[in-house]
């Protein structure tokens, strides 16, 4: 009986150690779009001729003292739970100081444009696995105050909601720290929230990340996606060949061909490995949509001698162009 008990204790220790050492997703805490709109911190962005409203991070962090405090408090809370954190403020500063900002790409020969919104660029640069969108509103209730909050965990690649919660803190003195009020509120649902994040990350390891891939043909390209090529005595359209490549390169062949025409192909729910080996230095690195797109582009270049361009839109989407870069 004693041996059985010792064996069970040993197994429990091994299991607990393995769980504690399991890799956790990298997190970046970002104010929710609703917060920016409600507080008037927005700006217009020209997305390929379409005017869209995007957050004005610079002005918000410069003029609003609460936003940096609340974002930092949430980041500290998650860091205390063992999650690696990407600092939003430092990432914004780094992007601002880059000499060559990639706000849009213009085709070298044809003048085609592929635009990336500021938030897409932020996600691609930060490479966090999960974005924590934090919306909060500090309200006065007579001589006291309370904080309304909405916390959502978003997969940075697929933009799907993983976990979340919303609520209102208890009424506290106006002198009480907003940090303390927020963290005490989050404690009430912490376990289920974090379990949702860890379960999602475990699913990614087993089934791969989810991304989207779009292929375009420029008018300058002599062939289109319906052009036929001979393989082992049979003829297949280029679209069918690309489709077969996706079956090879995805995790257990998991992807969906949403649409296909002579000039455009759109794949979604594309499951790619979390990690890949860099072909240049042989080292393991995180896989994103851009890296996956380059794999497909290299096949097009090698097999059909095409001019191919690869442009990321955030972490989870990539555009591949044939006939121009």
Predicted features, each with a name:
Residues 1-23:
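Bacterial Sec-dependent N-terminal signal peptides
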Residues 21-44, 160-254, 292, 298, ...:
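C-terminal/domain-edge helix-coil "capping" segments
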Residues 22-24, 65, 69, 73, ...:
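Extracytoplasmic
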Residues 30-33, 88-90, 135-137:
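Active-site-proximal beta-strand/loop segments in catalytic clefts of secreted hydrolases
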Residues 37-40, 95-99, 141-144, 222-223:
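Extracytoplasmic/secreted cell-surface and envelope-processing proteins
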Residues 43-126, 131, 235-303:
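N-terminal segment of the mature soluble domain
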Residues 130-176, 315-325:
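Amphipathic beta-strand/beta-sheet edge segments enriched in Tyr/Trp
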Residues 135-139, 254-260, 308-310:
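Short amphipathic beta-strand and strand-loop transition segments with alternating hydrophobic
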């Amino acid at each position: 009986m004693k041996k059985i008990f010792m064996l069970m204790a040993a197994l429990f220790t091994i299991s607990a150690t393995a769980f504690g050492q399991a890799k956790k997703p990298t997190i970046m805490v970002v104010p929710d779009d609703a917060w920016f709109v409600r507080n008037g911190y927005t700006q217009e962005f020209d997305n390929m001729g379409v005017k869209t409203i995007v957050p004005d991070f610079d002005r918000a962090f410069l003029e609003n003292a609460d936003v940096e405090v609340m974002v930092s408090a949430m980041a500290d809370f998650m860091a205390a739970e063992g999650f690696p954190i990407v600092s939003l403020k430092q990432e914004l500063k780094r992007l601002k100081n880059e000499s060559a900002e990639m706000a849009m790409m213009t085709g070298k020969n044809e003048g085609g444009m592929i635009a990336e919104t500021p938030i897409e660029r932020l996600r691609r640069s930060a490479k966090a696995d999960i974005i924590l969108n934090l919306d909060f509103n500090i309200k006065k209730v007579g001589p006291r105050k309370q904080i309304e909050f909405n916390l959502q965990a978003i997969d940075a690649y697929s933009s799907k909601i993983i976990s979340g919660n919303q609520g209102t803190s208890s009424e506290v003195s106006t002198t009480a720290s907003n940090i303390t009020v927020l963290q005490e509120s989050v404690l009430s649902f912490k376990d289920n929230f974090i379990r949702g994040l860890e379960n999602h990350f475990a699913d990614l390891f087993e089934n791969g990340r989810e991304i989207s891939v779009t292929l375009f043909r420029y008018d300058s390209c002599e062939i289109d996606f319906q052009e036929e090529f001979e393989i082992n005595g049979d003829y297949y359209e280029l679209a069918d060949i690309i489709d077969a490549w996706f079956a090879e390169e995805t995790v257990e062949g998991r992807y969906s061909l949403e649409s296909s025409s002579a000039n455009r192909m759109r794949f979604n729910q594309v499951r790619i490995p979390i990690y890949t080996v860099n072909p240049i230095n042989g080292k393991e690195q995180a896989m994103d949509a851009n890296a996956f797109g380059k794999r497909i582009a290299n096949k097009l270049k090698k097999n059909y001698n095409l001019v191919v361009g690869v442009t990321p839109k955030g972490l989870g989407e990539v555009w591949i162009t044939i006939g121009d870069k």
